[in-house]
Amino acid sequence: MMYNVTIRETLARTVQIEADTHEDAEFAARSLYRKCDIVLTDSDYIDTTFRVHGVPSYYKSPNNDFTLIKGDCVDTLSKFNFGFDMVFADPPYFLSGGGISCQSGKVVCVDKGDWDKPTTPEEMDAFNLRWLASVREHMKENATIWISGTHHNIFSVQQQLLKLGFKILNVITWAKTNPPPNISCRYFTYSTEFIIWARKSQKVAHYFNYDLMKLLNENKQMTDVWRLPAIGKWEKSCGKHPTQKPLGVLARLIQASTKPGAWILDPFSGSATTGIAANLLGRKYLGLEIEDEFLSMSKARREEIENISKKDEYVKRLAKAKIIIPQDNIFVTETIEERYGVPWL
């Protein structure tokens, strides 16, 4: 005889169990939930994804240590739960008001795009509060965030960080060793940018690789003034991004605040310099970007360092500049648990 047995869990469901008596059917149902040890082998796994609500990716590297997703950062982050070890953000500076500058001896327009047009202080504050609140929800309790800016936006960012409960650790001054000249000759040449370093929690301790930073600074404590060059031509082999950051800056802050294998988020991925630096240093990366042009450029940059000679060239350049100490086998090897533990496809 076939009996319908109701099993009450968080939700009730009915299964069909073939048995001679009601008691036998109930016993069979209970046996489905007995405690037991299960040992799985490779043959028990199938090539599938164990997620119903996975977020589709624009691109994933062959070993899944570099993922790009197309979409607005706030909207995309609302679709999944995941805790990152570190965040780097290069949000709009809101400075593209038709100004000019000098690059390679030529006068050029400094407009970056419509996304960087000046706005009101109130709108800037609301924008920064919105994306910072969203990112904070996806940071581990001991995670830190780095945010770059200039005087145009950095004070707004600082105020929103405090409002959300972050603890500001440092404000790094990036002093560019090769800044473009000021062609108006009416004020000092802009040669610096600021990078706020903050941790999510006031009380939970963060990670700081103090010894490595000291080693990279000739065994002296590293200060909050970093004298590093602006982006070099060798970093633009896959195209030009109007606000691309140099690998040297990203490599330093990634090493300072994460361990190998850490997950790093960039909500304004751009040309994915954060991701390239992360992978060169054995970290994993998720970048969010809305522009197809920049997604394509980022994909090309990541594919470029699949070439061992190109990867070695990048590492040697960074090592020569005393930004990193070369390591062997610096690409991350992914485990099955890690593959199915992320909420993107």
Walk through the language-model features, giving the residues of each:
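PRPP-dependent phosphoribosyltransferase catalytic core
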Residues: 293-345
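A short, charged, amphipathic alpha-helix used as a generic interaction element across diverse proteins
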Residues: 21-37
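Short polar catalytic/cofactor-binding loops
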Residues: 9-13, 72-75
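Short aromatic-glycine-(Arg/Gly/Cys) micro-motifs in beta-strand/loop hairpins
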Residues: 1-11
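A short, exposed loop/beta-hairpin motif centered on an aromatic-Gly-Thr core
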Residues: 12-20
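Core catalytic lobe of class I
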Residues: 56-297, 343-345
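Short, mixed-charge low-complexity intrinsically disordered segments
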Residues: 35-56
